[in-house]
């Protein structure tokens, strides 16, 4: 990947995060730092206490879906720790949905989406945004952001308070 493009993406994430904060929109983004030194070289901030959703599926011994993972790691539905993690999930899902819509980010597979130890999702790898496409194929995704049935299930369905909060954000 071209780290210069990743650096630009990180700067845009920081700008969008500042705009949301100034507008008092409680959507959450993690603007991690990248310093490109050359086309393929540079320094990227490590994002602590995270795992990709893809790695969860492949490496977690009893992984069935995200909702059950949340219950295993944050407590049963209704507990304070679970509800806090779910709120973090909703605010970060909203933040990255806004970001992906504005920047036209594509290639949002589960290897590019991290989950942290507080329930936030964090998107990484911004090789495909605006009309930039390393393989010159930018028409492969039509959705403006990633919202899966599994993400909706973590929010307790489309009729839930959490999903309504996501829509409001």
Identify what each model region corresponds to:
Residues 108:
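Short, surface-exposed polybasic-aromatic patches that bind anionic ligands, especially phosphate groups
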Residues 126-169:
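Long, cytosolic, alpha-helical-rich C-terminal regions that act as interaction/scaffolding modules
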Residues 1-105, 117-133, 138-139:
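Conserved ATP-binding subdomain of kinase catalytic cores across diverse folds
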Residues 111-115:
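Hydrophobic residue at the +6 position relative to the catalytic HRD Asp in the kinase catalytic loop
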């Amino acid at each position: 990947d071209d780290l210069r493009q990743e650096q630009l993406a990180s700067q845009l994430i920081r700008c969008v995060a500042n705009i949301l904060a100034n507008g008092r929109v409680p959507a959450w983004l993690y603007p991690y730092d990248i310093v490109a030194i050359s086309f393929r070289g540079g320094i990227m901030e490590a994002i602590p206490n995270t795992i990709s959703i893809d790695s969860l599926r492949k490496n977690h011994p009893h992984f069935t879906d995200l909702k059950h993972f949340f219950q295993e790691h944050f407590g049963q539905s209704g507990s304070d720790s679970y509800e806090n993690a779910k709120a973090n999930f909703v605010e970060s899902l909203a933040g990255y949905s806004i970001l992906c819509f504005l920047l036209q980010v594509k290639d949002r597979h589960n290897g590019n989406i991290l989950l942290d130890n507080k329930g936030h999702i964090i998107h990484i790898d911004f090789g495909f945004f605006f009309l930039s496409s390393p393989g010159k194929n930018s028409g492969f995704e039509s959705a403006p952001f990633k919202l899966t049935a599994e993400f909706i299930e973590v929010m307790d369905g489309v009729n839930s308070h959490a999903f309504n909060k996501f829509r409001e954000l």
